[in-house]
């Protein structure tokens, strides 16, 4: 949902042979200004993707949990799943909304677990204490993987099961 003149596009279709998956990546606008309305852009993209598939997954990259939740409710029953990204902390609210859309506010991150957003914790602590810091450096601690597995019924496009995962 960047405006015209920016390269790339934030959606596409993955052809798996027996079925197709529509994938959309959108940016929220709360504390991340400068983007087109993700709700309107989603409406437009979904109309196009629905011509080819009922399975549509949305990565909603946003800061505010309320904006993510509102987006999930707005598109409940319209898309298969909405998962939030950006905050790097997996939330404990994975659910299937009443219209059949799988939802989680944030899927978490993959990277060094003993870190702040993947960065050496001392650097981030210094930033908060002093108002500035040195260059960000990736933490050199054991990694972990977080995410969410959505099981989607291919004909209806509805989520039938949702399982957050953490692998250490």
Region locations from a protein language model:
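Acidic, metal/ion-coordinating pockets
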Residues: 1-168
